[in-house]
């Protein structure tokens, strides 16, 4: 099976490197049409089921989240789930590696996005949200050959680990005759990117290692995707 790796013209470094630092303890930090993923309805918080912290973030930034989620074609509750996982709803969260804000934008990513959107201060929560949602859309557009459910999970994995890691896992999945467009195939291939499987890598890549180097953060990335999806599903039930 031959895997077609998309060409990245804009955001090359940002897309490859990702947003979230791998294995980072949150206590240390924190002209073409856009096809819709899911259209967000008006939010109604069921106060008996939603925790106070979530209620507070929706009250403060819900309008901003919904605005940019709709603009870039996402369900706003998915964005809320990403924010919860990234920063635990802490607007001033900052990592040792420099990821900052509600959506934990990494410096390289932030610089590229800020130029594209003419944003001056990504430390402002609303600007940070806009930048993060815009970046998620850029990642989502890389996986147009997958189903929507798989696309969302591949996007989340790329947001966490970088698109380059996901591409390497897709290429390895294809070599193993799995469908590289399915998240389950990529999920199974991610742990195989570590150095302990370098004998396998010699059969896949001319440089005898993954194109973006060995990857030891697969467990964290998989847990990240699982957590965001779990939170998203909960929000779909709790928030209308």
Feature map (PLM): residue ranges:
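Positively charged n-region of N-terminal signal peptides that target proteins for export
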Residues: 1-5
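N-terminal export signals and maturation junctions of secreted/periplasmic proteins
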Residues: 6, 10, 14, 18-67, ...
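N-terminal Sec/ER secretory leader and immediately downstream segment
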Residues: 65-76
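Non-catalytic cell-wall polysaccharide-engagement segments
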Residues: 19-30, 111, 116-127, 131-134, ...
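Short, surface-exposed glycine/acidic/tryptophan-bearing loops
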Residues: 93-113, 175
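Short, small-residue-rich loop/turn micro-motifs
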Residues: 83, 106-110, 163
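Alpha-helical scaffolds flanking conserved acidic
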Residues: 75-81, 97, 149-157
């Amino acid at each position: 099976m031959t895997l077609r790796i998309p060409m990245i013209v804009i955001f090359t470094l940002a897309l490859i490197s990702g947003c979230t630092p791998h294995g980072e303890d949150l206590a240390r930090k924190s002209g073409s049409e856009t096809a819709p993923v899911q259209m967000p309805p008006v939010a109604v918080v069921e106060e008996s089921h939603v925790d106070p912290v979530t209620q507070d973030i929706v009250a403060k930034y819900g309008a901003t989240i919904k605005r940019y989620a709709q603009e870039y074609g996402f369900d706003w509750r998915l964005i809320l789930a990403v924010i919860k996982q990234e920063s635990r709803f802490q607007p001033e969260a900052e990592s040792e590696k420099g990821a900052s804000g509600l959506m934990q934008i990494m410096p390289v990513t932030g610089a590229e996005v800020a130029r594209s959107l003419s944003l001056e201060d990504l430390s402002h929560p609303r600007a940070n949200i806009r930048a993060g949602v815009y970046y998620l859309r850029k990642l989502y557009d890389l996986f147009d050959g997958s189903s929507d459910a798989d696309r969302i999970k591949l996007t989340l994995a790329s947001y966490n680990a970088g698109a380059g890691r996901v591409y390497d896992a897709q290429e390895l999945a294809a070599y193993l005759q799995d469908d590289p467009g399915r998240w389950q195939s990529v999920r199974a291939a991610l742990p195989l990117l570590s150095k302990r499987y370098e004998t396998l890598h010699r059969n896949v890549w001319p440089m005898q290692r993954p194109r973006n180097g060995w990857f030891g953060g697969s467990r964290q990335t998989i847990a990240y995707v699982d957590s965001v999806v779990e939170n998203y599903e909960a929000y779909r039930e709790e928030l209308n």
